[in-house]
Amino acid sequence: MAISPTATELLLASFAFCLVFWVVRAWQPRVPKGLKSPPGPWGWPLLGHVLTLGKNPHLVLARLSQRYGDVLQIRIGSTPVLVLSGLDTIRQALVQQGDDFKGRPNLYSFSLVTDGHSMSFSPDSGPVWAARRRLAQSALNTFSIASDPASSSSCYLEDHVSKEAEALLSRLQEQMAEVGSFDPHSQVVLSVANVIGAMCFGQHFPQDSEEKLSLIHSSNIFVENAYSGNPVDFFPILQYIPTPGLQRFKAFNQKLVQFLQKIIQEHYQDFDENNIQDITGALLKHCKKGSRANGGRIPHEKIVSLINDIFGAGFDTVTTAISWSLMYLVTNPEKQRKIQEELDTVVGRARRPRLSDRLQLPYLEASILEIFRHSSFIPFTVPHSTTRDTTLNGFYIPEKHLVFINQWQVNHDQKVWGDPFEFRPERFLTADGTAINKILSEKVMIFGLGKRRCIGEVLAKWEVFLFLAILLQQLEFSVPAGVKVDLTPIYGLTMRHVRCEHVQARPRFSIK
């Protein structure tokens, strides 16, 4: 027998619905006259859109932007989240209105990074933060892209990468002789860590430390947890549930800080302000001589947070970029051959490629840009927040509003790229194929924009170029016939590809 609801039950249900609707409306900020709130889909009570986002939020939000526009709003739990798409809209927010959108949200996962003192993840955005960011940028540039007077290389970065690329070539050859194949990521990660370690710590960076190797090979724990949309940041009860992922994230951050603190302390023991040879030395010198005004002088305990940011910026992004590059090239052998033909013509085989060759190697540069664009391995920037009430595209955005920047959508916008899902490096070349199309190259979004743009962007681009140039000059990369390479991204702060242990590398000529 069917049971029909009574009038009392219907009345109670209607009352409950109205109460929930009233509470939700009461939480929403008042919108000034003449403006409107950003549009977006209705979400589930209490949950919001967390189930809608699924395992690939960048794809879901890109589809929603087609319906609701470049400025849309969702909820994760009870937290409203502004989602920005479209290059013009994102530039307007992060560049033209950069002061309005330069904040960082106070998220739980961010508080676990260097105990909440990270320059990149902390909610600080005032004068002290700006001064320390400039200091970190200056120190990074000095010991990476600035010239090295004690070396024949053009800069510190070229010197470090050239040495590590040679070591990587040797390891790949040994792996081929012993096993017959290798996993690119596990081989590249050590070389990239040694490069940024040498720039940060010089001779103090350990070469064969088990602690270092353990941290390097477990770095995926960080990107698997510090991503846009992590439920632990929106449902506070999850902070008290000891899930394995959260426990590993806490442990990894603690171990990394302890590792860096130990190296910095050793560095301090023999510090000589008249003989500065690395980033840590430059920061220690600034501690002694800097002014306290506007945060210009930093306390010793803050050095570890700056070094953590620099080390992270120069490590994970570059490792992921090179690993993706090799996977794209084994699945597109004709593109790999074109790069190698260009290297043979411009560089030859008698010497190694150098950073000064970049302008003469446009096809390699175009291929790197296309790998950045097509993979979009950093799908979102680190989340932003508004620093004050503002407007964007006619929509009212209140202060302290959480903001997601969908870089994946920008890099796959059909209005910009025409055929965004085709892997075609040639799109970035000028009509005569001799140079990079600067206007189009600046539309690739991978390092953010504006006041929070990644301080290691130039370093990362140069490092990826030089590693790939040296590797591709010497080796031909492939997979055995019948092996299918899975290029499906695994979502995270940086997206990894499915690990492949079947990559092979053979000398293109006698390696000297």
Swiss-Prot record:
PANTHER family (alphabetical): CYTOCHROME P450 1A (PTHR24289:SF21), STEROID 17-ALPHA-HYDROXYLASE/17,20 LYASE (PTHR24289)
Protein name stated in the entry: Cytochrome P450 1A2
Record pathway: Cofactor metabolism; retinol metabolism; Steroid metabolism; cholesterol metabolism; Lipid metabolism; arachidonate metabolism
Pfam family, one: p450
Domain of life per record: Eukaryota
Main location: endoplasmic reticulum
Family recorded in the similarity comment: Belongs to the cytochrome P450 family.
Classification via InterPro entries: Cyt_P450 (IPR001128), Cyt_P450_CS (IPR017972), Cyt_P450_E_grp-I (IPR002401), Cyt_P450_E_grp-I_CYP1 (IPR008066), Cyt_P450_sf (IPR036396)
Residues that coordinate or bind substrate: F222
Cofactor(s) demanded: heme
Biological process annotations from GO: alkaloid metabolic process; arachidonate metabolic process; cellular respiration; cellular response to cadmium ion; cholesterol metabolic process; dibenzo-p-dioxin metabolic process; estrogen metabolic process; hydrogen peroxide biosynthetic process
Subcellular location: Endoplasmic reticulum membrane; Microsome membrane
Catalytic reaction(s) noted: an organic molecule + reduced [NADPH--hemoprotein reductase] + O2 = an alcohol + oxidized [NADPH--hemoprotein reductase] + H2O + H(+); 17beta-estradiol + reduced [NADPH--hemoprotein reductase] + O2 = 2-hydroxy-17beta-estradiol + oxidized [NADPH--hemoprotein reductase] + H2O + H(+); 17beta-estradiol + reduced [NADPH--hemoprotein reductase] + O2 = 4-hydroxy-17beta-estradiol + oxidized [NADPH--hemoprotein reductase] + H2O + H(+); estrone + reduced [NADPH--hemoprotein reductase] + O2 = 2-hydroxyestrone + oxidized [NADPH--hemoprotein reductase] + H2O + H(+)
Record's function text: A cytochrome P450 monooxygenase involved in the metabolism of various endogenous substrates, including fatty acids, steroid hormones and vitamins. Mechanistically, uses molecular oxygen inserting one oxygen atom into a substrate, and reducing the second into a water molecule, with two electrons provided by NADPH via cytochrome P450 reductase (NADPH--hemoprotein reductase). Catalyzes the hydroxylation of carbon-hydrogen bonds. Exhibits high catalytic activity for the formation of hydroxyestrogens from estrone (E1) and 17beta-estradiol (E2), namely 2-hydroxy E1 and E2.
